[in-house]
């Protein structure tokens, strides 16, 4: 469920120096929206070192994030459950001093370098926050343990292959909880017996779950000609994790000028969906790209012809059928109308769509479920119902309005805005 709210508070007045800034926000939504994320842009408020958020008088976990690694906090995020037509009030205190509050982690991300001295596949111990691989590397897929950055919340977990496919591979959980630190995407027999999840999808050269590829007018194309491939962990904590994949010097088609592309994946606690934000270093409106989901063997397709596409199906997650069980998954992608060029006919490999940038930007959303979950969906009909509700939430975002009554740098002028989903 993509319940993402982006609220950027614009401060048109001069910043008043203070050790504390207080904001009062009104939250409302026309539809039911569990764990709706609210994001406050901290740029108008100077240095922020800690924060406290209450919703209707109850403290709620929040997270401060430095998104560009400049030592300054850029955004504050928290989530709130919303009922149709309900208005809730969030009080936000931003402080220049004090120790940040500690809340239980509900998201996690890791980039792990292979350690040749470690035998067990779930015990590698060289952790990175980012890595860049040069074009001269012939097989980047095998540089990293679990082949790329992995990230999760309590409901879902994924990894992104660090090669020309940049496929998103899926991990299915039986119970809610963070698992990747223990399993590293390679669950042992002992861990399986304890109820840990495992890899659930065979992706091959398909889109997997929503990989972004080129488009040559006939079929999707891989990211073959890239000067530098980078993966980084931007943040992780009690509210959200953000990871990025950067392709510097990508020659999309032979004879064209290279472009730099950064794909940001944002996953919030309480969600089985995530945002995908794609940014280029120049206007690329005339170019076309492709995305979609893998056509799982004997799957049922879900397609409204208007940007919502997915499937429900069952297949082996690996070629080794002796040591794996059949896995049933539901996957979905939603591309807003302004980024959708057209829906492609289903192929043996993919349910695809052609997408178009607006200037330097593309946005879409992804979701999935595993039939293993004791908290998820267990039939094609249930999954299709979820996807329709998911799209409805995306098209009816939470409204956030600044109320009077704040202190210090709080602007007198109110401003409401729709969420960026």
Predicted features, each with a name:
Residues 96-224:
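Solvent-exposed N-terminal domain segments of exported/luminal and surface proteins
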Residues 261, 272-305:
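Acidic (Asp/Glu-rich), glycine- and aromatic
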Residues 20-123, 128-130, 134, 138-139, ...:
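Alpha-mannosidase-like glycoside hydrolase catalytic domains involved in N-glycan trimming
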Residues 193-268:
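Extended, loop-rich substrate-binding clefts of extracytoplasmic carbohydrate-active enzymes
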Residues 52-76, 251-256, 297-316, 335-339:
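Solvent-exposed beta-strand/loop surfaces of large extracellular or lumenal domains
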Residues 23-27, 155, 274-282:
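Short, well-ordered beta-strand segments enriched in hydrophobic/aromatic residues
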Residues 67-82, 331-421:
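Beta-strand-rich recognition/accessory modules
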Residues 1-23:
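Bacterial Sec-dependent N-terminal signal peptides
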């Amino acid at each position: 469920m993509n319940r993402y709210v982006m609220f950027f508070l614009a401060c048109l007045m001069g910043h008043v120096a203070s050790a504390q800034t207080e904001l009062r926000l009104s939250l409302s939504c026309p539809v039911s929206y569990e764990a709706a994320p609210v994001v406050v842009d901290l740029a108008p408020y100077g240095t922020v070192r800690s924060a406290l958020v209450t919703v209707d008088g109850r403290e709620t976990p929040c997270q401060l994030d430095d998104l560009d690694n400049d030592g300054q906090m850029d955004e504050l995020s928290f989530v709130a459950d919303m009922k149709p037509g309900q208005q809730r009030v969030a009080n936000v205190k931003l402080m220049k001093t004090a120790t940040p509050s500690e809340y239980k982690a509900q998201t996690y991300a890791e980039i792990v370098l292979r350690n040749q001295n470690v035998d067990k596949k779930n015990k590698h111990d060289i952790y990175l926050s980012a890595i860049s691989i040069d074009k001269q590397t012939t097989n980047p897929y095998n540089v990293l343990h679990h082949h790329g950055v992995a990230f999760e919340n309590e409901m879902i977990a994924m990894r992104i292959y660090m090669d020309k496919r940049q496929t998103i591979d899926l991990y299915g959980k039986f119970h809610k909880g963070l698992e990747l630190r223990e399993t590293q995407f390679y669950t042992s027999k002992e861990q399986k017996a304890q109820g840990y999840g495992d890899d659930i999808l065979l992706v091959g050269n398909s889109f997997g779950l929503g990989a972004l590829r080129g488009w040559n007018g006939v079929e999707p194309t891989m990211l073959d000609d890239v000067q530098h491939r980078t993966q980084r962990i931007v943040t992780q904590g009690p509210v959200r994790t953000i990871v990025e994949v950067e392709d510097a010097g990508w020659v999309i088609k032979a004879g064209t000028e290279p472009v730099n592309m950064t794909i940001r994946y944002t996953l919030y606690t309480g969600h089985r969906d995530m945002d995908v934000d794609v940014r280029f270093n120049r206007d690329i409106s005339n170019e076309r790209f492709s995305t979609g989901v893998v056509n799982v063997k004997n799957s049922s397709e879900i397609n409204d012809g208007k940007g919502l596409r997915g499937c429900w199906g069952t297949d082996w997650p690996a070629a080794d059928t002796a040591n794996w069980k059949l896995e049933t998954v539901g996957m979905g992608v939603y591309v807003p109308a302004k980024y959708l060029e057209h829906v492609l006919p289903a192929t043996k490999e993919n349910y695809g769509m052609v997408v178009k940038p607006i200037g330097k930007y593309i946005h879409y959303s992804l979701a999935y479920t595993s039939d293993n979950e004791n908290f998820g969906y267990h039939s094609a009909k249930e999954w299709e119902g979820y996807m329709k509700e998911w799209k409805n939430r995306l098209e009816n975002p939470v409204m956030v309005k600044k109320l009077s009554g704040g202190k210090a740098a709080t602007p007198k002028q109110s401003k409401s805005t729709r969420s960026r989903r």
